[in-house]
A protein has these predicted regions:
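Short alpha-helical scaffolding segments that buttress acidic/His motifs in well-ordered protein cores
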Residues: 56-60, 75-79, 116-123
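Helix-turn-helix
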Residues: 1-21, 25
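Hydrophobic alpha-helical segments that drive targeting, anchoring, or assembly
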Residues: 55-57, 72-76, 82, 88-95
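Hydrophobic/aromatic-rich alpha-helical bundle segments in the mid-to-C-terminal region
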Residues: 68, 86-93, 97-169
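Hydrophobic alpha-helical connector segments
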Residues: 37-74
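Short, basic, alpha-helical segments at the C-terminal edge of helix-turn-helix-like DNA-binding modules
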Residues: 28-34
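Residues in soluble alpha-helical coiled-coils and helical-bundle/repeat scaffolds
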Residues: 17-21, 25-28, 43, 47, ...
Length: 169
């Protein structure tokens, strides 16, 4: 890991004096990759509504194999981090809440945002643990289905405040 970082051993341990600091750094790197993908979508002006969820879908499906392998390693580090550090777990929960709030603000209903987020989480974990290896057709089918869900519900930005509750007769 030290060699891949390009730092000296002393510099590495200066930035990450504890295992918890290293795990937090890895978590920050993973969340930064997602944030950068979203920002790129915003800057290029081609993003339709629900751009944050669309960016997460792109992150899961459109990266070359080498980048996906790097993401796999980061996801594995995140799993370890969440298991070993309450601070990493708290940051992960906060990042998930923020992602769901962003999707809601972009016009995606709560249920759809949760389904997409949990499907992507499951896909990332399945790839990370190597318990799933989708063939190209299956990957494309999953990707298309997630986009269909986004398209079906992302019509207008959500209002701030309490979520709309369905009324029953």
């Amino acid at each position: 890991m030290i060699a891949e970082s390009g730092m000296s051993k002393g510099g590495f341990f200066h930035h990450f004096p504890t295992k918890a600091a290293l795990l937090l750094g890895l978590f920050d790197r993973l969340t930064s990759a997602v944030a950068a993908s979203v920002e790129h979508s915003v800057r290029d002006g081609t993003s339709p509504p629900a751009r944050s969820l669309r960016a997460q879908i792109r992150l899961a499906f459109d990266k070359p194999p080498r980048e996906r392998e790097r993401n796999r390693a980061l996801v594995m580090a995140l799993v370890v981090g969440v298991m070993e550090s309450t601070e990493v777990a708290a940051r992960a929960r906060k990042a998930n809440r923020r992602a769901l709030a962003t999707a809601r603000a972009e016009g995606v209903d709560a249920g759809t945002a949760l389904v997409i987020q949990l499907a992507l989480d499951g896909y990332f974990l399945g790839e990370a643990f190597k318990t799933i290896k989708l063939e190209r057709d299956d990957r494309e089918a999953l990707r298309a289905t997630l986009h269909t869900l986004v398209d079906a519900t992302s019509t207008r930005p959500a209002r701030h405040g309490r979520a709309h509750k369905e009324t029953r007769p």
